[in-house]
Amino acid sequence: MSLVAIGINHKTATVDLREKVAFSPDKIHDAMRSLACTTSSNEAVIVSTCNRTELYCNNARAEEVIHWLESYHNLSHDELMPCVYHHEGQEAVRHLMRVASGLDSLVLGEPQILGQVKQSFAKAKEAGTVAVTLDRLFQSTFSVAKKVRTETEIGTAAVSVAFAAVSMAKHIFSSLASTKVLLIGAGETIELVARHLKENGVSSMVVANRTVERAQAMCEEFGATAITLSQIPDFLPKADIVISSTASPLPILGKGMVEKALKQRRHQPMLLVDIAVPRDIEAEVGELDDAFLYTVDDLQSIIEQNMASRKEAAEQAEVIAQEQSFLFMDWIRSLESVDSIREYRTASMAIKDELVERALNKLAQGADGEQVILELANKLTNRLIHAPTQALTTASRQGDLNTLGQLRTALGLDKH
């Protein structure tokens, strides 16, 4: 038994199965306690996100962890098993380090997974299912993820349209904190854009949408103002940045509307990013002197370049994860050696205590002191050399010269 990682993810399982295997936040504490108690594992951490569910256990067998997962979610072996992957020992360590570093994510290098792994670890500590080994493993993993972020460029290049749009704005404006932003649309992409903008210090955001109720729901999260599409002409002159992504079949911003807004701005530059297909902003807007229009095609070329950059950085990150997983296993082995030494010393002390007690009893009964000491020395010697003698005999009979040599070295027989 050793460290075990069991899981399914976006590469091995459908959304339907991932939903069945996921653990809800309100039940995950009990699930981790059940996993630790039901299996031979004495430590357990469950990482459950929309793209993956993974179980990390110490001192467990892969088969029993898989069986527990099937039983917990009432899934058949045939349904789950084709989608499950499992790693043990050093490979389990390396896998966790790769996951936390974003090397196993749907979007290579995405940073959100590290936060999710940290949350899972915190919940496991709350549940009382983390001890020395998994605590050290996850702390080491967080250090590896930080090392990957600081020593490679895996997280610096935008690889989503939303992130690329905000990255472009950051390149054009020295600081986004003082800019006013108009977002057109209230779908998933615009919501992601708003999140990236908020993370970059933008405090003045207006969200325009066909249904203002949808925009208001999003605005509550980001402290933005919701308006209808018909109100855009009133708010456009105040916007330094316009990012649009709707499902409209016709353009929402025309050249005339933008030209009028620029005049009201006294020709202060305006960045417009159109990430809709079909376009939300007329192509002719790009002809205006103070309007800087970028489309989804412009962003896509940036994303492709950045993906190549991330893949190169990922190769460096893989080396870091591999090296650090080896170092962790060195620590595991040192821990095992400490345990072995402690057990060996305890066993030897028990033999000594037993024989000394017998010797003292004999002395108390008037036995000859010299004879008692000699008997104690002989018995102690015989008891202590019994196991090494058996090991030497077995290695010699089997012709195992390697083990024989190691035993001779360990017993100090080859000093001269």
Swiss-Prot record:
Q: Which InterPro entries match?
A: 4pyrrol_synth_GluRdtase, 4pyrrol_synth_GluRdtase_dimer, 4pyrrol_synth_GluRdtase_N, GluRdtase_CS, GluRdtase_dimer_dom_sf, GluRdtase_N_sf, NAD(P)-bd_dom_sf, Shikm_DH/Glu-tRNA_Rdtase
- Pfam families according to UniProt: GlutR_dimer, GlutR_N, Shikimate_DH
Q: Where is the active site?
A: 50
> EC annotation?
1.2.1.70
The UniProt keywords, alphabetically, are: NADP, Oxidoreductase, Porphyrin biosynthesis
State which residue ranges cross the membrane.
none
SUPFAM superfamilies listed in its UniProt record = Glutamyl tRNA-reductase catalytic, N-terminal domain (SSF69742), Glutamyl tRNA-reductase dimerization domain (SSF69075), NAD(P)-binding Rossmann-fold domains (SSF51735)
**Molecular-function GO term, any one:** glutamyl-tRNA reductase activity
Its function, per the record, reads: Catalyzes the NADPH-dependent reduction of glutamyl-tRNA(Glu) to glutamate 1-semialdehyde (GSA).
Q: What else is known?
A: During catalysis, the active site Cys acts as a nucleophile attacking the alpha-carbonyl group of tRNA-bound glutamate with the formation of a thioester intermediate between enzyme and glutamate, and the concomitant release of tRNA(Glu). The thioester intermediate is finally reduced by direct hydride transfer from NADPH, to form the product GSA.
Summarize subunit and interaction data from the UniProt record for this chain. Answer: Homodimer.
Per the record, the domain comment is:
Possesses an unusual extended V-shaped dimeric structure with each monomer consisting of three distinct domains arranged along a curved 'spinal' alpha-helix. The N-terminal catalytic domain specifically recognizes the glutamate moiety of the substrate. The second domain is the NADPH-binding domain, and the third C-terminal domain is responsible for dimerization.
Query: Which protein are we looking at?
Result: Glutamyl-tRNA reductase
Q: What is the scientific name of the source organism?
A: Shewanella amazonensis (strain ATCC BAA-1098 / SB2B)
Q: What is this organism's lineage?
A: Bacteria, Pseudomonadati, Pseudomonadota, Gammaproteobacteria, Alteromonadales
Q: Gene name, please? A: hemA
